[in-house]
Curated annotation (Swiss-Prot):
PANTHER family per UniProt: 30S RIBOSOMAL PROTEIN S18, SMALL RIBOSOMAL SUBUNIT PROTEIN BS18A
The family this protein is said to belong to: Belongs to the bacterial ribosomal protein bS18 family.
GO annotation, cellular component aspect: cytosolic small ribosomal subunit
Role description: Binds as a heterodimer with protein bS6 to the central domain of the 16S rRNA, where it helps stabilize the platform of the 30S subunit.
InterPro entries per the UniProt record, alphabetical: Ribosomal_bS18, Ribosomal_bS18_CS, Ribosomal_bS18_sf
Subunit note: Part of the 30S ribosomal subunit. Forms a tight heterodimer with protein bS6.
GO biological process: translation
A GO molecular-function annotation: structural constituent of ribosome
Swiss-Prot/TrEMBL keywords: Ribonucleoprotein, Ribosomal protein, RNA-binding, rRNA-binding
Gene: rpsR
Protein name per UniProt: Small ribosomal subunit protein bS18
Length: 84
């Protein structure tokens, strides 16, 4: 006879409600020249972090992506990381 392979369901964790930083601070603007702000949304490999990681809303995540791409074109941010 085969063993029963029923698994116990994982306990449900309450969903952590994250607020968009830019929605919380109404006066904070996303600018491609602000590299210190944009570097917080870029991984070590040079990729733009996902919205589920950063916790931003859809509109502000799009604005960040556009600002990062503009900063890369103007050579304020690298396209890839320098560490290999």
């Amino acid at each position: 006879m085969a063993k029963s392979t029923k698994r116990r369901p994982a306990p449900e964790k309450p969903a952590k409600a994250r607020k968009c930083v830019f929605c919380a601070k109404k006066n904070q603007q996303i600018d491609y020249k602000d590299t210190t702000l944009l570097r917080t949304y870029i991984s070590e490999r040079g990729k733009i972090r996902a919205r589920r990681v950063t916790g931003n809303c859809v509109q502000h995540q799009r604005d960040i992506a556009i600002a990062v791409k503009n900063a890369r074109e103007v050579a304020l941010l690298p396209f890839t990381s320098s560490a290999r």
